[in-house]
């Protein structure tokens, strides 16, 4: 009887699970409008609450809203909203927990007038202990950002690129400032009369006109996402007294000056000094990455004092509790490599001090992660290395074989102890005041990201937020299958297979090979809307980490130096072969796509094999030489190529997809951001498109106005949706036979001849024959 009862209970549970699954729906591309993201978590000094930025989609304005929320670390209550602005970011608790400073960008009433800038972000103060409205306490012409409280709570340091000329112009436009200036000006002598005669403008009628002409003198003059760089406005460190009420008339003071920007900064424990890093080189393109550490007196200002030099590019810097040491992450400069693992370093703040590498024997990436398409699209914040209260340990995230977890590093022994574990990606972390506990933002393949509280025991963390649970409880999502396979040379390659939620191994499915960019990056155990939606549309998605990927060790990452693309292509094809062996993929219905380096490899794939029925290359590269001349960073050092294209043109020709354009018969879609300065369309998709149109091959170009290289991750919401629709629509047409009127004008593919009728006139060296 008991056995029958147990069996009946099991049947009921199974039936309930089937019923619950039947109530769920498939994910759609438009679900992004309901997504919420968490960014920049900050733990209160008493460890009781976490302030964070909640990012949501404003579908009416096709943009993102950011507001500051908080949640208890007890995990027993829902988050509550703290600020009411549309663009509030960078929350920072005062040392006593009574105040919260944050950055607010005013809502623009429309496009700025010619010659003017949009409203600048300013610092605001929110009384937490007493409640009440926030108030603005900076008003700099070019705004303020990156606030940081002094440990004694009296001052707030921040960054601004406002310069004296900006302040003078602001005073000129402000009637109150002009009146104050007149009141303070020296009075005329009784024997002197003011000159009232009209005077012509100093330089003619256009004296006040601001030219929009750019005069370029530096190698790097624009950056993806940031636009054209203004070297006349270096970023400097300012301080302001922390106001106690909206009536306090506090005056910001500029601490650093000159033509060089300051990078990361940190307060000394006694609140007397601010330490910062800077690279005082006119054009860093010619130099190996490096930085100097300076200190400036916070109250008195004066000339900064140079403390030490670092012959690397430090990031995530953090001062020790006693203020005598500096911890940071950096990659060594030499030998010059395509990829060098970042390590964790510590050094004394003293002249001639040398950094010590704590992770020299740890063959994985420190201060690194894995990539999906749902990182916080705005106000994500950054991480710094965390010190233990006794100064004996450091904490940072490491990336290991597609996983990203928080680790503890013992400074004396270099022993490494996991703080978090599992198939996941820790995307942000913050410590309590004593570093006994950590608030971590964790993403998994079925969760965009939530806050958890973890302690140093390594036990399972406690979930604090459920920011997308209402939506995700309605969705039928599937977990990816992890696989390892052998490539052509016996090297093990790591990959994942995302299957449709109603997967049936007895059916035949179309497959999409998705290739990551970088090339030194990694897929992993993290949420990816694109993969989940492709699976929901009936595709099997294969996403591998071929050689050159991060999180698998130095040798695996750098093995493609001077050979990219090359053997990584073979890794990808071996992955497709591996999935075909499983029997549930139709070999005649294969698609391939990828972005950035993945777009380059997509172009390479269709120039070297005809096995794919369709391809979509995103933010791609067609010609390495053209990219060398136009990208937003330089390859002056011998990292990817041994020489510039005018000294060794053949190497660039051999490795450029455009060289093999006559081999391309696969229908190709090109996805381009018109403001992409990382892989400019003129060096990529535009070349592929024009060449294939000349050859009358099936090709289409989809252009996104105003979008940068980050289209898929942080572009305008509707553009992100349309991007997905076009990619999947292209595959629907060629892999599933669906009618797509928007692509009717595309020249249909012709049968591929048994042997290429028109091979390249001059076959490049090392060119590989098509399969």
Name what the model sees in each region.
Residues 56-60, 106-111, 163-166, 281-284, ...:
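Short glycine/acidic-enriched loop and turn motifs that connect beta-strands
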Residues 23-56, 60-62, 66-68:
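Mature N-terminal segment immediately following signal peptide/propeptide cleavage
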Residues 93-179:
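Hydrophobic or amphipathic alpha-helical targeting/insertion segments
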Residues 65-66, 110-121, 161-247, 277, ...:
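Predominantly five- to eight-bladed beta-propeller fold
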Residues 35-50, 85-103, 133-135, 139-157, ...:
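Conserved beta-propeller blade repeats
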Residues 73-76, 128-131, 242-246, 297-301, ...:
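Short loop/turn segments that connect beta-strands within beta-propeller blades
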Residues 281-282, 364, 458-459, 466-588, ...:
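Cap/lid segment of the alpha/beta-hydrolase catalytic domain
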Residues 530, 536-537, 543-771:
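Active-site-proximal cap/loop segments of hydrolase catalytic domains
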């Amino acid at each position: 009887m008991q056995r029958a009862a147990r069996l009946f209970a099991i049947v009921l549970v199974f039936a309930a699970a089937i019923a619950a699954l039947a109530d769920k729906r498939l994910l759609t591309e438009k679900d992004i409008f309901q997504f919420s993201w968490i960014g920049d978590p900050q733990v209160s000094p008493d460890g009781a609450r976490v302030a964070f930025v909640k990012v949501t989609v404003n579908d009416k304005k096709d943009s993102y809203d950011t507001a500051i929320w908080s949640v208890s670390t007890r995990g027993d209550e829902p988050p509550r909203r703290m600020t009411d602005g549309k663009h509030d970011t960078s929350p920072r608790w005062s040392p006593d927990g009574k105040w919260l400073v944050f950055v607010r960008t005013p809502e623009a009433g429309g496009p700025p007038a010619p010659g003017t800038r949009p409203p600048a972000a300013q610092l605001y103060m929110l009384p937490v202990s007493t409640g009440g409205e926030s108030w603005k306490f900076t008003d700099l012409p070019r705004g303020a950002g990156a606030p940081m409280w002094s440990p004694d709570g009296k001052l707030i340091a921040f960054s601004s690129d406002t310069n004296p000329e900006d302040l003078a112009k602001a005073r000129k436009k402000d009637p109150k400032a002009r009146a104050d200036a007149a009141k303070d000006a020296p009075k005329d002598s009784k024997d002197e009369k003011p000159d009232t005669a009209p005077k012509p403008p100093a330089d003619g009628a256009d004296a006040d006109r601001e030219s929009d002409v750019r005069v370029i003198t530096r190698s790097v003059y624009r950056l993806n996402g940031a636009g054209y760089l203004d070297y006349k406005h270096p970023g400097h460190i300012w301080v302001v007294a922390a106001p106690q009420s909206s009536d306090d008339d506090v005056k910001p003071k500029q601490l650093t000056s000159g033509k060089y920007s300051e990078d990361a900064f940190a307060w000394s424990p006694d609140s007397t000094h601010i330490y910062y890093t800077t690279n005082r080189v006119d054009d860093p393109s010619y130099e190996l990455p490096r930085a100097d550490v300076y200190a400036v007196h916070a109250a008195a200002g004066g000339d900064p004092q140079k403390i030490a030099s670092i012959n690397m590019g430090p990031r995530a810097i953090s001062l020790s509790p006693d203020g005598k040491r500096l911890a940071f992450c950096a990659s060594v400069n030499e030998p010059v490599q395509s990829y060098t693992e970042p390590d964790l370093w510590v050094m004394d703040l003293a002249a001639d001090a040398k950094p010590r590498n704590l992770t020299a024997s740890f063959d994985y990436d420190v201060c690194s992660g894995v990539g999906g398409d749902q990182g916080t699209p705005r106000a994500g914040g950054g991480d710094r290395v965390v010190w233990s209260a006794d100064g004996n340990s450091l904490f940072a995230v490491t990336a290991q074989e597609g996983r990203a977890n928080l680790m503890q590093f013992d400074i004396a022994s270099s022993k490494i102890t996991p703080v978090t574990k599992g198939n996941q990606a820790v995307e942000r972390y913050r410590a309590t005041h004593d570093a006994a506990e950590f608030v971590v933002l964790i993403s998994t393949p079925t969760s965009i990201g939530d806050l958890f509280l973890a302690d140093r025991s390594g036990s399972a963390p406690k979930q604090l937020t459920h920011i997308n649970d209402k939506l995700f409880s309605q969705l039928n999502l599937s977990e990816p299958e992890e696989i390892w396979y052998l490539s052509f040379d016996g090297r093990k390659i790591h990959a994942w297979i995302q299957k449709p939620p109603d997967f049936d191994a007895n059916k035949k499915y179309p497959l999409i090979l998705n290739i990551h960019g970088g090339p030194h990056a990694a897929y992993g155990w993290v949420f990816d809307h694109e993969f989940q939606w492709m699976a929901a549309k009936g595709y099997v998605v294969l996403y591998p980490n071929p050689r050159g990927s991060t999180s698998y060790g130095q040798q695996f990452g750098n093995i493609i130096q001077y050979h990219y693309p090359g053997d990584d292509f073979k890794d990808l094809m071996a992955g497709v072969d591996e999935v075909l062996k499983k029997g549930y993929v139709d070999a005649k219905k294969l698609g391939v796509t990828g972005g950035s380096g993945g777009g380059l490899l997509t172009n390479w794939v269709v120039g070297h094999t005809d096995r794919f029925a369709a391809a979509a290359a995103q933010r791609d590269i067609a010609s390495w030489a053209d990219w060398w001349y136009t990208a937003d960073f330089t390859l002056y050092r011998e990292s990817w190529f041994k020489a510039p294209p005018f000294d060794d043109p053949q190497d660039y020709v051999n490795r450029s997809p455009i060289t093999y354009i006559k081999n391309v018969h696969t229908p190709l879609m090109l996805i381009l951001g018109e403001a992409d300065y990382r892989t400019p369309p003129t060096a990529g998709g535009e070349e592929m498109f024009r060449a294939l149109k000349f050859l009358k091959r099936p090709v289409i170009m989809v252009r996104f106005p105003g979008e940068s290289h980050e289209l898929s991750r942080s572009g305008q919401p509707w553009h992100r949706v349309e991007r997905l629709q076009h990619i999947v629509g292209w595959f629907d047409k060629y892999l599933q036979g669906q009618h797509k009127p928007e692509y009717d004008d595309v020249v249909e593919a012709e049968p591929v001849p048994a042997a290429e009728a028109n091979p390249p006139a001059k076959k490049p060296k090392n060119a590989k024959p098509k399969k």
